[in-house]
Regions:
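Patatin-like phospholipase
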Residues: 1-250
Length: 250
């Protein structure tokens, strides 16, 4: 129904709680992963690598970290499908339909983007077990105006109103969320592309950016990483923050 303009978007929200469907994303992920022999988190574990995805459980009002919290949804961690987890983690409220999943007790969980509760969960990789000599480094966009588009003005329709709410919330979280030590180990990338009057801030929910805009963001990231590596002082970071990290928890 999202193909029928504002009315279609409003109807999609009314009947499915989201403007766009994410089933295509799950199918695309399956097509990308299956040739590599990866279907579940267990398959990833066998490669010696780890993957964590965060999901907001609106039913229980809590953050889930998959695959560890898979039992909350009635499945074993090693058997949880990666493509399904990606779909859940990508379902930004209002923009995309939530994923519904019934657990072993018959309770239906409404699951959306983990960024609703923790938009920068770099702490997930600080599990307190591996004790790597260096911390996990993160990349995040920060800077510019809170949104790359005009805000909600006049008398917007229901869909545009709710989209503006979610875009603003997500962008503000992007700019403000950081726990002890996270800021110092984060490579902050400017989301501003172009110069002068042509400058534009790419927001978290700008899904239709061009290839040129994508390349500009990539170039911003490369420059930010080079600057970070020139000034990074691990000894100083460890002295100031290592003992303050609450490994794998918030």
């Amino acid at each position: 129904m999202d193909h029928f303009g504002t009315v279609g978007k409003a109807l999609s929200l009314l009947f499915t709680l989201g403007i766009y469907h994410t089933g295509y994303l799950e199918q695309w992920m399956k097509q990308m992963l299956e040739p590599k022999g990866i279907r579940t988190f267990g398959d990833i574990s066998e490669t010696g690598r780890r993957l964590f995805l965060t999901v907001s459980d609106l039913t229980r009002r809590r953050l889930l970290v998959l695959p560890g919290d898979a039992p909350e949804l009635g499945m074993e961690p090693e058997e949880f499908p990666v493509a399904l987890a990606v779909r859940m983690s990508s379902s930004i409220p209002v923009f995309f339909e939530p994923v519904r999943m019934r657990d072993g007790q018959g309770e239906t969980h409404i699951l959306v983007d983990g960024g609703l509760l923790s938009n920068y969960p770099v702490w997930v990789l600080d599990d307190g077990v591996t004790r790597r000599p260096y911390p996990t480094f993160g990349f995040q966009f920060r800077g510019g105006s809170p949104s790359g588009r005009a805000g909600c003005t006049g008398r917007p329709g229901l869909a545009e109103y709710l989209k503006s709410i979610m875009s603003t919330c997500i962008d503000v979280i992007d700019n403000n969320y950081a726990a002890a030590g996270d800021d110092a180990r984060t490579i902050w990338i400017s989301p501003v592309i172009g110069e002068g009057k042509a400058a534009r801030t790419i927001g978290s929910t700008d899904f239709g950016i061009t290839q040129a805009e994508s390349q500009a963001l990539f170039d911003n990231g490369r420059q930010a990483a080079e600057t970070f590596l020139k000034t990074w002082d691990f000894a100083d970071w460890e002295r100031r923050y290592r003992s303050k990290i609450n490994f794998g928890k918030r």
